[in-house]
Structure formats: C-alpha cells, structure tokens
UniProtKB/Swiss-Prot annotation:
The keyword Transcription regulation does not apply. It comes from Bacillus thuringiensis subsp. israelensis. Gene3D superfamilies: Delta-endotoxin CytB-like. GO terms for cellular component: extracellular region. Keywords: Plasmid, Sporulation, Toxin, Virulence. GO terms for molecular function: toxin activity. Pfam families: Bac_thur_toxin. This is Type-1Aa cytolytic delta-endotoxin. Belongs to the cyt1/cyt2 endotoxin family. The keyword Amino-acid biosynthesis does not apply. Active after proteolytic processing. Kills the larvae of dipteran insects by making pores in the epithelial cell membrane of the insect midgut. Acts on mosquitos and black flies. One of its GO terms (biological process) is sporulation resulting in formation of a cellular spore.
C-alpha cells in the first residue's frame, strides 16, 4: 500500500501521522459528549517545548466546538467552524481568528489522491505562513489518512461513522494542529479542522481505500486559524500543569 510520505507501512498502522525526522508531538485529548467521552486528535508542531502546555490548553478549549452533524451522519461529531468562532472569543489570554473556511469539495469517479490534493489546497490557504517543511509533511500525512488507511483507524476516536446506504458511506474526521515555529514568530497558531465526508462506496471498500483507488466524494471542510501570543508554561497555574501531565485536561 503506497502512502504519500513514504513512511513504512508498519509505522502508519501504529501512528498514521508519523513522518521521518518529524518534530511533531501527537496528543489525544478528551472531548465532552452527552453519551460518552471521545478523543480529538491533536498534532502539535512545537519548536520550543516550553509552549507545549499552551498547545494543550488551546486544543482543550476547541474541543467544545465539536457538535452533532446533520441527519446523514447520525450521532457523529465534527468540528463546527461557527461554534469555533464563538469559543475563540472566550479564550484567555486573548487571541484572534486570522482566517476561517466552510467549503465543499467534490469529485466524480476520480482517484482518491485527487481529492487529497484538493483538500490540501484548502487547508494550506488556512494555515498560510506557518507552512514550514515539517508542517507540510504533517498536514499531508493527516489529510492522506483522512481518506486512506481507514481500516487501521476505524475504531479510533477522531473518526465517527455515520449512516450508510447500499452505495454510500458517511463519516466525520476531526484533527487539530497547534503550531509554534520560526514562521509563527511571537504567536501560536491553533487550527482545528472538521470533515464531513460522503463517499459513493460501501464501508468495506472505504476502509481499504488507497490513493490509487477511485471514488466520488462530497466533502465539507470547516476550519479556522486562531493566533494567540506565546504563553510560557510557567505562567499557567500549577493545577493546569498537573492536569496536562496526567492527561486530564
């Protein structure tokens, strides 16, 4: 099975976002749900580990922007850009939404790789100047695994399976990037992304899609880029630091 980042397949099965010589840190965080606790995948590109806690705090805040989807997706949750804008106004220290997107991307009976490239172009526009080489690697890997390698992720908490028909599978996929590097300067960028994906294939096929397979897609992408001045871990209350270490944030 081919993958765009040329990572060994065994690495993808364990961690589909792993890329060679990457500095990204992958942290799973819990989101509130009326029925159960679920996870939101957070991919953090942090040059200075002194700001890891800030990345966790931002991801924790945007967890509350995961909302139920339309009837086609049943009880699935996805990141909502409008809800994310509301939450951005409540985050302290104060930051600002730099850009946001709510866009549909479609294709008819074309290779999965074509859809991946279309989605990448949308998200590259949202991320903007934060796109260092390693960030592009992580973004490409994350988007690739939104559409492929799904059998290895089918029970993971960042993917929600919606209603199925005889010829269509619906699912949502949620991921969040926190970025602090030379390109971001004195701020951290937090970029939550929610996908609603309708694909004209049965689930058994979708689970084993590769980039060479062909399918028709209707994908809704909702995302925003939130910029917050850098906050040293020492500036957070000790209770927040303890919670982050224990994974209870």
């Amino acid at each position: 099975m081919e993958n765009l980042n040329h990572c060994p397949l065994e690495d993808i099965k364990v961690n589909p976002w792993k890329t060679p010589q990457s500095t990204a840190r992958v942290i799973t965080l819990r989101v509130e749900d009326p029925n159960e606790i679920n996870n939101l995948l957070s991919i953090n590109e942090i040059d200075n580990p002194n700001y890891i806690l800030q990345a966790i705090m931002l991801a924790n805040a945007f967890q509350n922007a995961l909302v139920p989807t339309s009837t086609d997706f049943g009880d699935a949750l996805r990141f909502s850009m409008p809800k994310g804008l509301e939450i951005a106004n409540t985050i302290t220290p104060m930051g600002a939404v730099v850009s946001y997107v709510d866009q549909n991307v479609t294709q008819t009976n074309n290779q999965v790789s074509v859809m991946i490239n279309k989605v990448l172009e949308v998200l590259k526009t949202v991320l903007g100047v934060a796109l260092s080489g390693s960030v592009i690697d992580q973004l490409t890997a994350a988007v690739t695994n939104t559409f492929t390698n799904l059998n290895t992720q089918k029970n993971e908490a960042w993917i929600f399976w919606g209603k199925e028909t005889a010829n269509q599978t619906n699912y949502t996929y949620n991921v969040l990037f926190a970025i602090q590097n030379a390109q971001t300067g004195g701020v951290m960028y937090c970029v939550p992304v929610g996908f609603e994906i309708k694909v004209s294939a049965v689930k058994e096929q979708v689970l084993f899609f590769t980039i060479q397979d062909s399918a028709s897609y209707n994908v809704n992408i909702q995302s925003l880029k939130f910029a917050q001045p850098l906050v040293s871990s020492s500036q957070y209350p000790i209770a927040d630091l303890t919670s982050a270490i224990n994974g209870t944030l």
